[in-house]
């Protein structure tokens, strides 16, 4: 009589064990310090990569894709995001990292309150409109949002996902010689025709910017993201690396407080405050993803 309940318990334990083993940690890491267009300010986003990889390897990530400098074209970044979506399974853990320039682009979809899209800058994106790039080489927040939501749909509500953006979407014309700023002050005036629509109603591919994950950003929207000098690395990347290596455990508020404290201690005269956002920031901990 007791054998049947015992068999049920053993079967349940085996099922739970298999479910846990099926959970896969996957990452996409993008870092740019070089660009096809020489007009971009020299930065060191590529030097963030080793620090990120050390964190991920320590956390036993099984699938890690890196795109560095000339590898990180718009087409390759999009392909990597789509491939990540296709490989993901329910309950997976996903880490996405972007270190590079950011730029504001005049919003072609009219979905932004200020008519400006925040863009990641792939290797083949140009700082100003030209024959090589009329805006199609920039990766807008609208596009990124679609890819990220597709990934979220694949991993399901119990999957965990974080996006780390060590960039800045506004620059500073007063940049000094001893500071390296990720971002530029000029707005890219996109040619709307390349998007294939002329009004918001015609654009069925632009989704509302739901954020069903945790996002760590290097600074607030009105601030600049200044790199560290020693070591030469992104400030948010190095803050996250340092605190994870120090095993700063606890909930997200505790870890983020440590990250902000580190950035503040390594910031000069201009303030830089990292931002934690996303619907999931109170649902699970960053340490669940990186430890």
Where are these regions (language model features)?
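Bacterial N-terminal signal peptides
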Residues: 8-17
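Cysteine endopeptidase catalytic domains of the caspase/legumain-like
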Residues: 18-291
